């Protein structure tokens, strides 16, 4: 196996592992919110429906991430997890409309698990997206450098 083939195999394996870990994190988000869902319908119905939407979105994104590593899917998963973190922080600081019971309640075990899982998805998604951005910027820079060289001096391998 050549170095280029090995590099391609390594990238595919790393990409598959990253997508799998992110999918597990998104499924974890859905599970954590399923566990707190029953009490929300009677207390704050809009939060109940937001949790349902979050669970469906998380599972849908997890399913899509298993099949593809498209940057738009990574961005959606990263933004969704970040929004959940923002909502959690707001619920513990200022409170949410019709829901101030959790203000100052930072040591909730499911809340901590949620922050860990969503923080992991945000970190992983941001890392994947940043690495792709760096590679595309480097590729564009290399393409511009080749285009600016006199025709006879261009690298025939395309590197």
Q: PLM features: residue spans?
A:
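Membrane-interface extramembranous regions
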Residues: 2-159
């Amino acid at each position: 196996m050549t170095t280029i083939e090995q590099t391609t195999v390594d990238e595919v394996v790393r990409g598959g592992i990253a997508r799998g870990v992110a999918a597990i994190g998104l499924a974890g988000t859905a599970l954590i919110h399923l566990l707190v869902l029953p009490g929300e319908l009677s207390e704050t119905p809009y939060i109940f429906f937001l949790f349902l939407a979050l669970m469906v979105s998380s599972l849908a994104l997890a399913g899509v991430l298993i099949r593809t590593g498209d940057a738009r899917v990574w961005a959606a998963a990263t933004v969704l997890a970040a929004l959940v973190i923002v909502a959690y922080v707001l619920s513990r600081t200022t409170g949410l409309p019709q829901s101030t019971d959790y203000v100052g309640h930072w040591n909730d075990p499911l809340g901590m698990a949620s922050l860990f899982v969503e923080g992991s998805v945000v970190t992983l998604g941001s890392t994947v997206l940043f690495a792709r951005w760096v590679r595309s910027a480097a590729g564009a820079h290399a393409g511009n450098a080749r285009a600016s060289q006199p025709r006879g001096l261009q690298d025939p391998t395309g590197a």
